[in-house]
């Protein structure tokens, strides 16, 4: 697992001449559901204004940008790892796996993959090994990573809304599966089901009672 913190001048020059995929994740901390990642290759000829870290945008703005990214991006793909995979691999390795799935699902082969954070897995696409860099706070610095953060965030939030409709007693639409007081009270009263991450301490403690 490679760790990169700076880009060379040659890397930066590559941005304007080659396809670059931005990758980000959402959902490492929640107690329930998949960890969701996205890979996005933007079209330099169709700029998208207002891209930023998805957490710094309002829900309304994220939704609008989600639609614009889907329309204008050269390629994007969502990758995920299930609660069972998270329990088997741990959340870090499951997140890396989900990122690899997002990149491998792109319809175009990027010359470079830029990942938000301080770690990057090894990426391949159609049998080719890809160069990659991780960039701390990249979701606020690199447009393609910002776009990936928005795609991943909106996708997972919609999935939590759907889970809320199926299990309204848990309040997923509000806390999105994160370990809030209201969520702890809900699982204490109603228990957990198969979408919960059984290796996470609060869930594991409940199951061991």
UniProtKB/Swiss-Prot annotation:
Compartments where located: Cytoplasm
Cofactor: Mn(2+); Mg(2+)
Enzyme class: hydrolase
Reaction catalysed by this enzyme: Endonucleolytic cleavage to 5'-phosphomonoester
Binding sites annotated in the UniProt record for a divalent metal cation: 24-25, 116
Source species, domain of life: Bacteria
Principal location class: cytoplasm
Record function comment: Endonuclease that specifically degrades the RNA of RNA-DNA hybrids.
Family to which this protein belongs: Belongs to the RNase HII family.
Protein name per the record: Ribonuclease HII
Protein species of origin: Shewanella oneidensis (strain ATCC 700550 / JCM 31522 / CIP 106686 / LMG 19005 / NCIMB 14063 / MR-1)
